[in-house]
């Protein structure tokens, strides 16, 4: 067995031992629902003036109207 193979074997062994000890210490327990909501909570953002808007409530000023784009097509943009 050469040095590289021995290093890989030791790395795999350390990973397996680490996973086993994390499981014994409760490292793989599922998150509680409130923890998941805290971690994945979306920050409130709004679409600035002049940007395309699919819904009025996403615009910073809550107003969205049809305007001509560079191709002459009518698209909804935040006012």
UniProtKB/Swiss-Prot annotation:
Signal peptide from the UniProt entry: 1-22
Matches recorded under InterPro entries: Omega-atracotox
Propeptide: 23-40
Disulfide bond residue pairs: 46-60, 53-64, 59-78
Record comment regarding domains: The presence of a 'disulfide through disulfide knot' structurally defines this protein as a knottin.
Organs and tissues of expression: Expressed by the venom gland.
Gene Ontology, cellular component aspect: extracellular region
Intracellular or extracellular location(s): Secreted
Purpose of the protein: Inhibits insect, but not mammalian, voltage-gated calcium channels (Cav).
Organism of this sequence: Hadronyche infensa (Fraser island funnel-web spider)
BP GO terms, sorted: defense response
Pfam families on file: Omega-toxin (PF06357)
Stated name of the protein: Omega-hexatoxin-Hi1d
GO molecular function list: calcium channel inhibitor activity; toxin activity
Alphabetic keyword roster: Calcium channel impairing toxin, Cleavage on pair of basic residues, Disulfide bond, Ion channel impairing toxin, Knottin, Secreted, Signal, Toxin, Voltage-gated calcium channel impairing toxin
Family in the record: Belongs to the neurotoxin 08 (Shiva) family. 01 (omega toxin) subfamily.
Record site feature (Critical for insecticidal activity), residues: 52, 69, 77
